[in-house]
Amino acid sequence: MGWLRGIALLSLGVLLAGRVNCQHVKNNVPRLKLSYKEMLESNNIVNFNGLANSSSYHTFLLDEERSRLYVGAKDHIFSFNLVNIKEYQKIVWPVSHSRRDECKWAGKDILRECANFIKVLKTYNQTHLYACGTGAFHPMCTYIEVGSHPEDNIFRMEDSHFENGRGKSPYDPKLLTASLLVDGELYSGTAADFMGRDFAIFRTLGHHHPIRTEQHDSRWLNDPRFISAHLIPESDNPEDDKIYFFFRENAIDGEHTGKATHARIGQICKNDFGGHRSLVNKWTTFLKARLICSVPGPNGIDTHFDELQDVFLMNSKDPKNPIVYGVFTTSSNIFKGSAVCMYSMTDVRRVFLGPYAHRDGPNYQWVPYQGRVPYPRPGTCPSKTFGGFDSTKDLPDEVITFARSHPAMYNPVFPINSRPIMIKTDVDYQFTQIVVDRVDAEDGQYDVMFIGTDIGTVLKVVSIPKETWHELEEVLLEEMTVFREPTVISAMKISTKQQQLYIGSATGVSQLPLHRCDVYGKACAECCLARDPYCAWDGSSCSRYFPTAKRRTRRQDIRNGDPLTHCSDLQHHDNPSGQTLEEKIIYGVENSSTFLECSPKSQRAIVYWQFQKQNDDHKVEIKVDDRMIRTEQGLLLRSLQRRDSGIYFCHAVEHGFIQTLLKVTLEVIDTDHLEELLHKEEDADASKTKDATNSMTPSQKIWYRDFMQLINHPNLNTMDEFCEQVWKRDRKQRRQRPANAQVNTNKWKHLQENKKGRNRRTHEFERAPRSV
């Protein structure tokens, strides 16, 4: 009788589950979505959960040669092993008690501001790093010894050598900073005062006098937030090298109606030493241009993503022309969205060689400068390549004067293909970080993007060309939760040597591999449908793709993801997926409900169901109605009827490929037949269970009558009324029990409460079911 009781309870549980609305699968959802628990269980993540007295693991420095990841945090600098970040060394660098007290007396937060937050961490030479921190609103810098060779295993601070950090690190830990250390000189975009109002791009260290941008001139910098700094060669002559700063700032007056934020790219020459009579110890080659990342709209009205969040440079064969990837978000509080735009340095240089922005006319508006531009052109580095000047101090006065009053370019820099390569507007998160890896696949090279979000997830996205390489399709491969609690991802580094990704947040550091081919499945079709450039079918499993591997059994199709073409010769023609079909037999009771569970691994797959009657080869597609409800987890059948008996097939359609996931045989038992079976089994077991029956309570003896009434009343309102009658009857019976019986019942109830944590399945068939 146990199997019948199990059927009945299953039917009753589904009936009480209520209605579930079917949601259509969206095309822009991740193919695989892995929770933090799933990442841990599959051993695909390593976590450093931080120290009790530290936080803010935001400043990363990757050293592939030493196989170390250096991380600057609150009062600490860490040296993590790239293979396993659980192996690390640390340096404690707090502020003195007097500094902390001064910070507190200035009205700052003792925990969130009055500490030493590491903001600069750069390679100084072969043996030392250079580090700067906020120092409780007194910036300071020092040197970290790391040894000459990886095997030296040295990691210590030079306690006797501290420097003033003004112009290198911000005072306020909440402010962003961008820095670059080249040839012993530190280039920093930061705030240089206690109040956080004097923003500038500095060059410090080295043998030359410190140099900076013009002070208190909004045409140069207007309340900027610096993102990153990069050295990009201009030509084969090192004298032409330029430093590029990426930042966002408030739009200049007259540049935009109302208050707005603009993303910028700024340039300075590496050999700029300031002017002779004007712009002394100030940049003479500083220029800036706006970065556009927008979606073209109707009537010429574009949707702009102006809040630049992060930048990644993808190096190419030509070091002068890396591809610039930028992550942007919207400024609007109403419309929340993120985008990734891609820029070429050719377009950037074209803008810097274009017209300068100039204010003119009755409305004093910004227009392209139409007058004579002095020679050599402002913004050009002094070298033998573009002129005969040896130093910026030799430049004519008219060049310096023009550069001082015209730091901005009129034309903006548009992205490649004039639109973003990825947009997200229908989600509850925004992009914060990006790193990119260029991967060799069977049919070409692909850029795989790893995008961090403000809720602690990482998106793995590949850009795939459509008809041409200029039209790109973004395929969201995975969404991975990499921290236990939602948190903003504030730093990311990629190690192509270790094939690992490192992620930083306020709470800790996480490490995960760039590829997890086994998560896609154990069949050729599943591996092919994944369209992951890292992975290919090797004849027996979905594994890491290597260009040097044998091609005879290797299957990979990133551009089209067509398993029919690439997997049909490896398997039987009727089953090119190579996947074993799961088969089930389910029993249901007439007039009740049952649920056929079928959920594909891929979230991009669209599920549809087919029905086949017994002894009939004809299959018909199931149409959704009031009785047949399709959900993301399967098919809900309400008010079962005899004609519902048959075979149900669950199919998944993805990228034009149909895959059968499940075959379910449903047997519907009518209520009269079920009652007859129950009574027959009761009579057959009567002699064997006489003693047990005598010991049963009245509520247990009438269980079948209760159950049959429930089956015959599938309406939830009627069931509520019936349950109320059962509860009233039980209360009446308890009141009529003798006092000693009541005491024993209370003891038994107490024991039951003590055992609530035990697995209910263990005793499911050892007790009679409760009254509803």
UniProtKB/Swiss-Prot annotation:
Leader sequence segment: 1-22
Region (Disordered), start-end ranges: 730-772
A Gene Ontology term for the protein's cellular component: extracellular region
SUPFAM superfamilies, alphabetized: Immunoglobulin, Plexin repeat, Sema domain
UniProt-listed Gene3D superfamilies: Immunoglobulins, ligand-binding face of the semaphorins, domain 2, YVTN repeat-like/Quinoprotein amine dehydrogenase
GO biological process: fasciculation of motor neuron axon; motor neuron axon guidance; negative chemotaxis; negative regulation of protein localization to cell surface; neural crest cell migration; neuron projection maintenance; positive regulation of cell migration; regulation of synapse organization
Chain ranges of the Sema domain: 31-514
Reported function: Induces the collapse and paralysis of neuronal growth cones. Could serve as a ligand that guides specific growth cones by a motility-inhibiting mechanism. Binds to neuropilin.
Family according to the record: Belongs to the semaphorin family.
Name used for this protein in its record: Semaphorin-3A
Organism of provenance: Gallus gallus
